[in-house]
């Protein structure tokens, strides 16, 4: 069958590709046999570097395009929106429409590997998705473990059987960046953190609290002083103490980390909303559920704040300067859920 007589105009392959491996390649190869064009949608494209997403969108795009230097494969970015499937679906449909504006017969292609593959059934416009068989159980998590635990590039030889050679060469060049030393240190810190809980009879679930404090079009944030996420912006918050309510814990953490010059009764009286955020993979430290409180202080002069405790710095940021790539874990999406700034 020639390229001009493919059954589908375009097939869409969604993933994080962190990094791109032979399992991903098998899907793209299958898509190229079935469609004129393939749109590779890269999730978590605007997240700050972390253990689960150590590569930027541009780096992942370069790894994919090293294997497919053809106009038939379009590599495009998308954000995650873990708490709003409708926004996520709309973002993907919009970016695909831009990538292949003339395509009429569009479908999804992928492999239903686990709970993260639910997306294959939530795009009603793209019917009859193409299912592709798993390729040898290749897992990007295992690849990340290799690259985050070794600085010896000879150790990467084992990856040559599960990654395209051009992708592996591209990735090896990226791993010399100083940013990866930070991610490697964070990986070791998280590993030790999890090791401390190995003897527990059940995997632990942690409860945290966060404060989304706004005033006069500004949001109160802190700069994290410790790993994971050292140096990233974050909401004031932390782990819930056993003897306190979630509300009291949120106010306590807010006061400890920002020294905000607002009385506790005023803070409590300014709470406009509260919501639980429980995406299973929201934290690298393990299963962590957070309760966030929206505290709207109205208009007026911004209260003085000062970083303390776990926070290196506390500061007010205009809404339009709150950027996903600067924020820790899923904090951008918590903020967006309350303020709709995304």
Show which residues each predicted segment covers.
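Nucleotidyltransferase catalytic core that binds NTPs
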Residues: 1-192
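Conserved G/P- and acidic residue-centered "switch" motifs that form tight phosphate/ATP-binding loops
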Residues: 21, 236, 254
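Short, conserved active-site loops that position catalytic residues or coordinate cofactors/metal ions
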Residues: 41-46, 229-237
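Functional cleft and adjacent loop/helix regions within the main domain
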Residues: 90-98, 106, 137-141, 155-184, ...
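A short, structural micro-pattern
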Residues: 102, 137, 205, 287-289, ...
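Short, well-ordered beta-to-alpha junction loops that form the rim of enzyme active sites
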Residues: 110-114, 224-225, 291
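N-terminal strand-loop-strand
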Residues: 191-235, 262, 297
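Unchanged
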Residues: 239-337
């Amino acid at each position: 069958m020639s390229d001009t007589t493919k059954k589908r105009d375009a097939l869409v392959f969604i993933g994080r590709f962190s990094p791109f491996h032979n399992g991903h390649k098998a899907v793209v190869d299958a898509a190229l046999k079935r469609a004129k064009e393939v749109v590779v949608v890269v999730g978590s494209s605007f997240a700050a570097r972390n253990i689960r997403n150590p590569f930027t969108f541009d780096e992942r795009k370069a790894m994919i395009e090293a294997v497919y230097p053809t106009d038939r494969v379009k590599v495009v970015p998308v954000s995650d929106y873990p708490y709003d499937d409708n926004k996520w679906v709309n973002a993907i449909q919009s970016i695909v429409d831009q990538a292949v504006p003339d395509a009429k017969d569009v479908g999804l292609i992928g492999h239903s590997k686990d709970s993260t593959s639910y997306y294959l059934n939530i795009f009603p416009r793209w019917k009859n998705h193409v299912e592709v068989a798993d390729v040898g159980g290749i897992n990007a998590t295992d690849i990340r473990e290799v690259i985050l635990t070794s600085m010896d590039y000879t150790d990467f030889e084992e990856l040559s059987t599960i990654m395209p050679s051009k992708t592996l060469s591209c990735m090896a060049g990226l791993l010399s960046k100083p940013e990866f030393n930070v991610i490697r240190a964070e990986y070791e810190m998280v590993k030790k953190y999890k090791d401390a809980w190995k003897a527990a009879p059940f995997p632990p679930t942690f409860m945290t609290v966060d404060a989304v404090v706004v005033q006069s079009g500004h949001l109160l944030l802190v700069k994290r002083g410790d790993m994971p996420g050292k140096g990233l912006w974050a909401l004031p918050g932390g782990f819930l103490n056993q003897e306190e309510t979630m509300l009291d814990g949120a106010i306590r953490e807010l006061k400890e980390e920002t020294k905000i010059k607002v009385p506790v009764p005023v803070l409590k009286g300014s709470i406009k909303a509260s919501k639980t955020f429980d995406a299973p993979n929201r934290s690298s430290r393990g299963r962590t559920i957070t309760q966030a409180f929206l505290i709207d202080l109205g208009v007026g002069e911004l209260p003085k704040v000062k970083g303390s405790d776990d926070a290196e710095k506390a500061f007010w940021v205009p809404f339009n300067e709150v950027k996903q790539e600067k924020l820790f874990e899923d904090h951008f999406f918590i903020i967006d859920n309350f303020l709709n700034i995304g």
